[in-house]
Amino acid sequence: MIWHVQNENLILDSTRIFMKAFHLPLFDGSFIFPEGILIFGLILLLMIDSTSDQTDIPWFYFISSISLVMSITALLFRWREEPRILFSGNFQTNNFNEIFQFLILLCSTLCIPLSVEYIECTEMAITEFLLFVLTATLGGMFLCGANDLITIFVAPECFSLCSYLLSGYTKKDVRSNEATMKYLLMGGASSSILVHGFSWLYGSSGGEIELQEIVNGLINTQMYNSPGISIALIFITVGIGFKLSPAPSHQWTPDVYEGSPTPVVAFLSVTSKVAASASATRIFDIPFYFSSNEWHPLLEILAILSMILGNLIAITQTSMKRMLAYSSIGQIGYVIIGIIVGDANGGYASMITYMLFYISMNLGTFACIVLFGLRTGTDNIRDYAGLYTKDPFLALSLALCLLSLGGLPPLAGFFGKLHLFWCGWQAGLYFLVSIGLFTSVVSIYYYLKIIKLLMTGRKQEITPHVRNYRRSPLRSNNSIELSMIVCVIASTIPGISMNPIIAIAQDTLF
């Protein structure tokens, strides 16, 4: 009798444990509904691809786009909810993480229309391209909400693997293969360095992997000012530096930008920086809270090197994509200012605001490059000479996006930089802000050089590419032009829109 009672109690306890273990992921899964929509979209794409023919190609774009739009909608409906830590501490939802997830989804939503005509012209496989884009987006979203060292390592690897495959998507292109090999080798090395830094952090905290628990562990073990934390800081900074691509971790960027398909470059140029910025902000602000006197000077050096080298080397480039690669290195230097300033002086809000404008400016520029490349087959800056005489709309759109990237008033880029530099100045980063102002002037110089070429009417400067330029019918490139128009409008928003955007960004801070 006693044996039967004990046996029944054991069965009941086992059942409760099983139900609790089953209920936990099911309950937590309801809080990652935006990510779940993307996963469902991925499965649907695979199912349709395995049962359809080439006539169903428009459905692939529709499913991908609607999945991203629905994910954005679900994310907005979740706005203002209480912060939650899910999946036994692996994932955290709060407004700060969600605004970065929104930016990543926005990037992907704008990038897919840029790819439609390009993929058809280059005869690339469509389904795989969309699968890689959605999977990379999913990895970036999980990285934004990652709350422990394992997830912070696995999520960017998901993003990176898709990035490697996308950069080498044109397999017959030698430059694309070279770019992929460099990207893969540098990415593998940086991941090894990053996980080595995590091992120092894990050991110093007494075996903790959650970000907040690492802080508590460092306090308990009295290791928060130890040499081990300094070593971890250096290795983690180098590992994250590859994702952000500041100088001197920028060597892969120009080659990958030049060799990869242009829509892929547009996608990588914004999503990788948004996801890495979200991760870097949380890592530096939480586990290395007690080491701010060490990582502030370290990031200042990276920001100065990025702003100077990126903008100076961009002057000498002859390829539009290589020029934008070095320009992006300079741009990440400005973003680092916001990370250094932190929450105290509105640094995070200014960083988020500037990244929102940077997405529109950069994607608008790449949309123009994709259109010009499809119609002429060239990427050389000199071949843009006289474009205004053949296609004023495209030339003006490119000019507006470049001027906004340079930070000329009254365009959006000017007000984004102004707020970012003002927050840096209030935080006492006078030298860093001065370097930022100087390099912004330098960037305006090489952007104006390109705009001068666009507007020139002298026949001796116009190359055969523009002389034989034929504008495609409206129905042919309407998806690219739609993305371009949206980005150009967002890049030219006057400063009157800054206050509500900054207010929303400030409300998201943790």
UniProtKB/Swiss-Prot annotation:
Membrane-related topology note: Multi-pass membrane protein
Subcellular location: Plastid, Chloroplast thylakoid membrane
Keyword annotations: Chloroplast, Membrane, NAD, NADP, Plastid, Plastoquinone, Quinone, Thylakoid, Translocase, Transmembrane, Transmembrane helix, Transport
Enzyme Commission numbers on file: 7.1.1.-
Reaction equations catalysed: a plastoquinone + NADH + (n+1) H(+)(in) = a plastoquinol + NAD(+) + n H(+)(out); a plastoquinone + NADPH + (n+1) H(+)(in) = a plastoquinol + NADP(+) + n H(+)(out)
GO biological process: ATP synthesis coupled electron transport; photosynthesis, light reaction
Bilayer-crossing regions: 26-46, 57-77, 99-119, 124-144, 149-169, 183-203, 227-247, 295-315, 323-342, 354-374, 395-415, 418-438, 484-504
InterPro entries in alphabetical order: NADH-Q_OxRdtase_suN/2 (IPR010096), ND/Mrp_TM (IPR001750), Ndh2_N (IPR045693)
Gene Ontology terms: cellular component: chloroplast thylakoid membrane
MF (Gene Ontology): NADH dehydrogenase (ubiquinone) activity; quinone binding
Family statement drawn from the similarity comment of this UniProt entry: Belongs to the complex I subunit 2 family.
Function: NDH shuttles electrons from NAD(P)H:plastoquinone, via FMN and iron-sulfur (Fe-S) centers, to quinones in the photosynthetic chain and possibly in a chloroplast respiratory chain. The immediate electron acceptor for the enzyme in this species is believed to be plastoquinone. Couples the redox reaction to proton translocation, and thus conserves the redox energy in a proton gradient.
Subunit structure: NDH is composed of at least 16 different subunits, 5 of which are encoded in the nucleus.
Protein name: NAD(P)H-quinone oxidoreductase subunit 2 A, chloroplastic
